[in-house]
């Protein structure tokens, strides 16, 4: 749906129409410029009323290209052309014109509300998509900024200054400020999602989109992102049991350690940004194809696509990120109870995480606190999953492609064919040698005969084994891919046969039509022949009659001319020769 407004006799489209449609509207408007109708003055010299003039000026002509639901074609509806109706005479006519203009303007407003602009909806939806993408980017930036500042504050407060210093307070205030901005961005992000839901589903009330599931996830996301170290110095008593000596260890720890580690849960924003920036999600063609195939474009689908395209890169980035984050978390958990500086050292923590990730577990380093043990447990689970994924990726990389399989099968088939021929030739050769040494010699050498018989049996077993290998190779070659290819070939052949049969049926129908026409012509032929013969007979008789008339006329003229000559000869005077 798009609308054009009247501006000086030229319609200028307000929405992004195609160039051809825009040019068509402009040519139509230039050929027939729209002008507001003027009120016609009555016979008595009365002018239009001021209300009619105001209505005529306020209700300027407006063309709305609408697309109603019951019709797919674009219709041009002209509104506001009756604003200044012509007066029948005097002020009464002017008043009538003003009333018609007011009704037309109200009809225009109601029609605008009824026929809402689809182009405007699509543009609004696209703008909401872009705003949601930018909000997600900003949320990730502020979330990562808070994590980085938290790590800096934790490291500096452990080695450079204490929690009661002004620097720690300033950094915590900065973390709190970034967290407040992050929460605001998340709330606005979900507001944009609700607006998108309303645009997509045509809902009028935003409370329709607020399901219990959506409310739960919004509250959970706000709770996860709201956790951060609070400005101030707050401590608690932490009791743990040492690993090897099993002696209890009690120390005073900061509350910040409990509030700092959950901040790494903000990294889920990376998956959201990857989804919103993915070409599969932003491309209209891919989304249309996915909608036709009933595919939901979510983070899981994007991760599967990345694992298919670049599995090594994804696993490498994930493993290194998990390694560094888990090592720092173990260091932060263990530094209050690690008296020998083993696991509280960053390099030592990385070694502990690496042997736990790879499921080796030498036992030279173990965590002392339940926090460190929980991190090591999660690391072991992630390591088992990553190891399985690495094995699957390596196996897929080592697997032959379809073309390589075809080449390998062809080469193996050629070699097995040669081996079958060689084994068959060996069987024939040993058969001939056995016959030669038993039938064609005077004295039979039994040792030589047994040797050839032994070789004969070996050749037979070799021939059987080679044929068995050839059967196995043929069975391996007939994979599901080849069967699917054969099925596609058969489908193409059947489709071709159906097209040919349809063409043949059309030709038969055409031939039947021509035969019917020919039969009708043959049935009409005797009548045409008789009609032609009668016409020719009439023409012949008329010709004969004309010839007869001509002959009679000619004979009559001839007889008259001869009689004239005889009369002239009888009445003429005699000549001198006749008188003598």
UniProtKB/Swiss-Prot annotation:
Residues 48-61, 569-580 have a biased composition (Low complexity). The chain crosses the membrane at residues 140-160, 169-189, 215-235, 257-277, 306-326, 375-395. Pfam families: CaMBD, Ion_trans_2, SK_channel. Inhibited by bee venom neurotoxin apamin. Inhibited by UCL 1684 and tetraethylammonium (TEA). Keywords: Calmodulin-binding, Cytoplasm, Ion channel, Ion transport, Membrane, Phosphoprotein, Transmembrane, Transmembrane helix, Transport. It catalyses: K(+)(in) = K(+)(out). Small conductance calcium-activated potassium channel that mediates the voltage-independent transmembrane transfer of potassium across the cell membrane through a constitutive interaction with calmodulin which binds the intracellular calcium allowing its opening. The current is characterized by a voltage-independent activation, an intracellular calcium concentration increase-dependent activation and a single-channel conductance of about 3 picosiemens. Residues 1-68, 88-116, 551-580 are annotated as: Disordered. The calmodulin-binding domain (CaMBD) forms an elongated dimer with a calmodulin molecule bound at each end; each calmodulin wraps around three alpha-helices, two from one CaMBD subunit and one from the other. Brain. This is Small conductance calcium-activated potassium channel protein 2. Residues 346-366 dip into the membrane without crossing it. Residues 413-489 are annotated as: Calmodulin-binding. One of its GO terms (molecular function) is protein domain specific binding. Gene3D superfamilies: 1.10.287.70. Changing residue 337 to N: Loss of inhibition by apamin and the organic molecule blockers UCL 1684 and d-tubocurarine. No effect on inhibition by tetraethylammonium (TEA). Residues 551-560 have a biased composition (Basic and acidic residues). It comes from Rattus norvegicus. SMART domains: CaMBD. It is found in: Membrane; Cytoplasm, Myofibril, Sarcomere, Z line. GO terms for biological process: membrane repolarization during atrial cardiac muscle cell action potential; modulation of chemical synaptic transmission; positive regulation of potassium ion transport; potassium ion transmembrane transport; potassium ion transport; regulation of neuronal synaptic plasticity; regulation of potassium ion transmembrane transport. Changing residue 396 to K: Does not affect inward rectifier potassium channel activity. Does not affect apparent calcium affinity. One of its GO terms (cellular component) is dendritic spine. The modification Phosphotyrosine is found at residue 161. Belongs to the potassium channel KCNN family. KCa2.2/KCNN2 subfamily. The keyword tRNA processing does not apply. The gene is Kcnn2. Residues 88-104 have a biased composition (Gly residues).
């Amino acid at each position: 749906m798009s609308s054009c407004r009247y501006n000086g006799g030229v319609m200028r489209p307000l929405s992004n129409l195609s160039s051809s449609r825009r040019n068509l509207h402009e040519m139509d408007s230039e050929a027939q410029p729209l002008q507001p109708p003027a009120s016609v003055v009555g016979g008595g010299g009365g002018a239009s009323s001021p209300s009619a003039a105001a209505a005529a000026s306020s209700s300027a002509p407006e063309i709305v290209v609408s697309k109603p639901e019951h019709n797919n074609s674009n219709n041009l509806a002209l509104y506001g052309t009756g604003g200044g109706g012509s007066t029948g005479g005097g002020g009464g006519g002017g008043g009538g014109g003003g009333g018609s203009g007011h009704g037309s303007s109200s009809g225009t407003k109601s029609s605008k509300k009824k026929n809402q602009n689809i182009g405007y909806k699509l543009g609004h939806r696209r703008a909401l998509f872009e705003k949601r993408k930018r909000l997600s980017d900003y949320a990730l930036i502020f979330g990562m900024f808070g994590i980085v500042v938290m790590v800096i504050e934790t490291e500096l407060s452990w080695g450079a200054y204490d929690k009661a210093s002004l620097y720690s307070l300033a950094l915590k205030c900065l973390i709190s400020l970034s967290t407040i901005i992050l929460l605001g961005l998340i709330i606005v992000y979900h507001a944009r999602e609700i607006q998108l839901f309303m645009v997509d589903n045509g809902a009028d009330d935003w409370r329709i989109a607020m399901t219990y599931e959506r409310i739960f996830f919004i509250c959970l996301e706000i709770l996860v992102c709201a956790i951060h170290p609070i400005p101030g110095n707050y401590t608690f008593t932490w009791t743990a049991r040492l690993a090897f000596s099993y002696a209890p260890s009690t120390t005073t720890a900061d509350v910040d350690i409990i509030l700092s580690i959950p901040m790494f849960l903000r990294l889920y924003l990376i998956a959201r940004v990857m989804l919103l920036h993915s070409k599969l999600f932003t491309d209209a063609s891919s989304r249309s194809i996915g909608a036709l195939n009933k595919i939901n474009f979510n983070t899981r689908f994007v991760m599967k696509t990345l694992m298919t395209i670049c599995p090594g890169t994804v696993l490498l980035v994930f493993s290194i990120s998990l390694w560094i984050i888990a090592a720092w978390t173990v260091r932060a958990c263990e530094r209050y109870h690690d008296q020998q500086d083993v696991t509280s050292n960053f390099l030592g923590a990385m070694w502990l995480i690496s042997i736990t990730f790879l499921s080796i577990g030498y036992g030279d380093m173990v965590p002392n606190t339940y926090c460190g043990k929980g991190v090591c447990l999660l690391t072991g689970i992630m390591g088992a999953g990553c190891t399985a994924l690495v094995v699957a990726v390596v196996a897929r990389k080592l697997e032959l492609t379809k073309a390589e399989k075809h080449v390998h099968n062809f080469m193996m088939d050629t070699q097995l064919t040669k081996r079958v021929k060689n084994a068959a030739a060996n069987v024939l050769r040993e058969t001939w040698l056995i016959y030669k040494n038993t039938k064609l010699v005077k004295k039979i050498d039994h040792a030589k005969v047994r040797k050839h018989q032994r070789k004969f049996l070996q050749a037979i077993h070799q021939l059987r084994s080679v044929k068995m290998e050839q059967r196995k190779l043929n069975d391996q070659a007939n994979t599901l891919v080849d069967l699917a290819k054969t099925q596609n070939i058969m489908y193409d052949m059947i489709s071709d046969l159906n097209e040919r049969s349809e063409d043949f049926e059309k030709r038969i129908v055409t031939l039947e039509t021509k035969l019917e026409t020919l039969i009708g012509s043959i049935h009409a032929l005797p009548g045409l022949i008789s009609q032609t013969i009668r016409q020719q007979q009439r023409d012949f008789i008329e010709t004969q009659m004309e010839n007869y008339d001509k002959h009679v006329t000619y004979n009559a003229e001839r007889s008259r001319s001869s009689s004239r000559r005889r009369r002239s000869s009888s009445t003429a005077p005699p000549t001198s020769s006749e008188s003598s």
